[in-house]
């Protein structure tokens, strides 16, 4: 009861062909193929864009920035 035999699948295929017809199914498959092609093209375009970007410059955190020493002794709160 849980598994479908070959006869069940044949009946399903015949019903689908009768409902949709040969032309609609081929049009649907063509639309699916175009969608897949445009998706792959978009992925390739993204890869090309990523390759063209310049690498990010790294910042050396080992050396502290050169700045004047801070003195809070002479400051007054207003």
From Swiss-Prot:
Q: Which GO terms describe its molecular function?
A: protein transmembrane transporter activity
The terms describing its cellular component in GO are: TAT protein transport complex
As for membrane topology, the entry says: Single-pass membrane protein
UniProt lists compositionally biased (Basic and acidic residues) regions at 43-60
- For whether the record's keyword set contains Transmembrane, the answer is yes
Q: Which Pfam families match?
A: TatA_B_E
For this UniProt record, the keywords arranged alphabetically read as follows: Cell inner membrane, Cell membrane, Membrane, Protein transport, Translocation, Transmembrane, Transmembrane helix, Transport
Presence of the UniProt keyword Kinase in the record: no
> Quick one: where's region Disordered?
43-78
For this protein, the record's InterPro entries field holds: TatA/B/E, TatA/E
Q: Where in the cell is it found?
A: Cell inner membrane
Instruction: Give TM segment ranges.
Output: 1-21
GO BP terms: protein transport by the Tat complex
Its subunit composition reads: The Tat system comprises two distinct complexes: a TatABC complex, containing multiple copies of TatA, TatB and TatC subunits, and a separate TatA complex, containing only TatA subunits. Substrates initially bind to the TatABC complex, which probably triggers association of the separate TatA complex to form the active translocon.
Q: Which PANTHER family match?
A: SEC-INDEPENDENT PROTEIN TRANSLOCASE PROTEIN TATA (PTHR42982:SF1)
Which NCBIfam families does its entry note? PRK00720.1 (NF001940), tatAE (TIGR01411)
Quote the protein name from its UniProt record: Sec-independent protein translocase protein TatA
The source organism is Rhodopseudomonas palustris (strain BisA53)
């Amino acid at each position: 009861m849980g598994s479908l035999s070959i006869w069940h699948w044949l009946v399903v295929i015949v019903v689908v062909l009768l409902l949709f017809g040969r032309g609609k199914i081929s049009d649907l498959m063509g639309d699916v193929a175009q969608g897949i092609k445009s998706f792959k093209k978009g992925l390739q375009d993204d890869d090309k864009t990523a390759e063209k970007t310049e690498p990010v410059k790294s910042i050396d955190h080992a050396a502290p920035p050169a700045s004047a020493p801070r003195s809070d002794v002479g400051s007054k709160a207003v």
